[in-house]
Structure formats: C-alpha cells, structure tokens
Amino acid sequence: MTILPFLAAVFVLQLLSTLTVAEIKSFTISNDSRPVILLEKFGIIEIGHVTVSVSSVSVLSPILDSSKLGFFVLSEESLPHVLLELQQNFSFCVLDSHYILHFFTFVDLSPPPRSQFSKSYPITSPNDYSLFFANCVPETRVSMKVHTEIYHDLYPNGSRDYLLAGSAQLPGLYLVFFLCYLSFLCFWLCFCWNHKQIVKRIHLLMTALLLVKSLTLICAAVYKHYVKVTGTAHGWNIVFYIFQFISVVLLFMVIVLIGNGWSFLKPKLHVKEKKLLVIVVPLQVLANIASIVIGETGPYTQDWVSWNQIFFLADITCCCAIVFAMVWSMCCLRETSKTDGKAVKNLAKLPVLRKFYVLVIGYLFFTRIVVVVMKMKADFTYQWVSNAAEEIATLSFYCLMFYMFRPIEKNEYCDVDDEEEIVELSLK
C-alpha cells in the first residue's frame, strides 16, 4: 500500500467525517479496488463495541493473498505513527502495523460459497476512532456485503447507546429548539391575528416557514432518539428529510421575496426577481438531494466525496447569488433616486434594507463557514456544540427577520404611499 491513498482517505476523514453517524449500517461494496476504504468514524468516551460482519465476499486478483485484505480500527492518537511507517516504506501494508486495532482479515472467512465472518471488538480507551478496510494487494477488486454496529455499553442491563460521543445530546437539543419554535409560532399567529387587517401574503409564507421548521426539529429529535435507542431510524429519517427540504427551500424563498420587496413594496415580482428564484430554488433542491445522499450513505461509497462537493458548490453558489442580488438591488435603487423625484423619499427605506442584507449575509457566513470550521476543529466529544451554534444562529435570524417585517401600521419598510409609486419604484 502506498502512502498517497491512505493520506487521501485521512484527509477526507478530517474534512467530511462530521457528516457520518455511528449506528447500525448495512451496505454493499461492489468491484472496489481502492487500497483503503473509510467505513466509519466514531468517538468512544466509555466502554464501547464495534461489530463487523461480512458476507458474500468475492475477490478478483491475479495474486490472491487473503492476509493482506482486512479490517482495522485506527485511533486519532495512532494516526501519526502509521503515517510515519508508510513514509519509511511505501510498500508497507497498514494491516501489519503495531499501532492499529487489528480486526480480521479474509483468512478468517468461511469457505465459499458463504464466505462470511463476524467479529465484535471491545474498545475501552476513550478516543476518536476510524474503521477502515484495507486492500494491500495490487490490482485486486473486492465485492462484499458489510454490516456494522457501533455502540456504547452504558447500562448494567445490557442496553446500548448507538449515538456515540458528540452526538448523544442531539435528541434533547432538537427537542428544546422545537419547543422554542413552537412558542415562536404561537406568538406569531397571535400577533398576525391581532393585526389581520394589514397582514400581507409574505406574512402567510413566513408563518408556513415557522411551522415547517418546527416540524423539522421535532422529526429530527424523534429520528435521533430512535437511532440512539435502537440504532435505526424506523423511517423517521425520511420524514425528517422531507420537512428539512421544504424548510430550506421556504427559507431561501422568503429571503429572496423580502429582499425584493414582494407584497411590501410591490404586488408582484418582476422578471429579474423571477430569474433569481429560478436560480435559487433549483440550487437548493440540488443541495438537499446531495445532503440526503451524504446522510444516507457514507465514505465507503465511491462517489461520496463527489456528492459532498456538489452539496458545497450548490449551497455556496445559491448564497452568493442571493448576496449579489441584494447588493445589486440596493445600488440600482440608489442610482434610480438620482433621476426619479418620487424615489428620493423612498431612500429612507435603504437603512432598513441595508440592515436586512447585513443580517442575511451574517447568517449565511456563520452557518456556512463558521459552523463548518467548528465541526472540523471541535473535540470529538463536543461535536454537538456546532449543531447548537447553528440552531441558535438560525433562531436568532428568524427572530430578527420576523421582528423587522412584522405586520404593523407604521413599518418603515412597508410604508408606501400608493400603487402608482410602487410601480415606479420597481426595478426594471
């Protein structure tokens, strides 16, 4: 095994592994020739177990050496030592290292046609671990069915906790934020009811956004609870992905519509705003599809890194399109006021627009950049902190946005004299 494939796998591990979840998983590896395959990343804070079962193993190789094909667990502390061994000898097989937790090799497999084996390994040292499959035989392709179970033995009665270090707090965290959003929704509904004479269409869309966000969080809490207790989601992952998809698309639609003054400054969207929606919505659809694929598979999938790249590019492109449209819209409004007398008095609305644009840019920067850095840098026992930071930032953004554009009579952003002025103010 050369050092380059192993370094590539380690790089992917450090960059993207916060997206993997330690639970019960079953997957198939088909005709794969990769020298090393990252199967799972997990953290253990007390006594834990790793169980790996393989079946229907098939190997295509010109020179078969079953002892050079197998599974191992590598701790974060041992990683530098293994890299040093590979640097000193490029042909060194990582399965021969003294720094790994050796699981089993294909020598242990039962005879064909079943070709299966299962082993459970106790882990008693708290650390950040990674489960790998190594193929040290050149030009060898492997196909097999793999079943993994990773859990904590926390209770004397033998019950298991499948949400490992850094994720065990997620069910309670999502439940708390669900209650926050539910209270927010009730307050918003009461406020809109008391001001129903001036409620606009955008306020109805904002109400739908709050409702779907609340449902997303309660589904996330139930989803993580079932994974924690049983190791599987029992279908709640599908419900969660549906509401998450609707929530994200609604959020970006609300941002675009508010930023362009729909139902506040003008009764309908113009061509440029419609084009922006045509760009933003499909990009978010693509990003959500990529997010689902990433969440439901893992680094053992050959195109997993590509899906991560698709998610990142689609999401960042969408955010950049929104920021560019906001800045361009403000510049156009400022230039229009120099030649249009009726538009001059509406420059008073620019400070409010500017505040909203700064709020959006700050929110996008924090959730897309700062949170990702937190996930990469945080200790494995504090991975949940990045989730908490993201939810706090999102709730704060919602509160400020809803406060700025609440349905009141004297709203400096919504106060427009008449429909004729609205049409003249519209950016063509």
Swiss-Prot record:
Residue positions with a glycan: 31, 89, 157
UniProtKB keywords: G-protein coupled receptor, Glycoprotein, Membrane, Receptor, Signal, Transducer, Transmembrane, Transmembrane helix
Signal sequence region: 1-22
Membrane topology: Multi-pass membrane protein
Pfam families from the UniProt entry: CAND6-7_N, GOST_TM
GO terms for cellular component: membrane
Similarity comment text for this entry: Belongs to the LU7TM family.
GO molecular function: G protein-coupled receptor activity
Organism: Arabidopsis thaliana (Mouse-ear cress)
A single GO BP: G protein-coupled receptor signaling pathway
Function, in words: G-protein coupled receptor. Plays a role in plants and microbes interactions.
Cross-referenced PANTHER family: LUNG SEVEN TRANSMEMBRANE RECEPTOR, RE59932P
Protein name, entry field: Protein CANDIDATE G-PROTEIN COUPLED RECEPTOR 6
Keyword Ubl conjugation: no
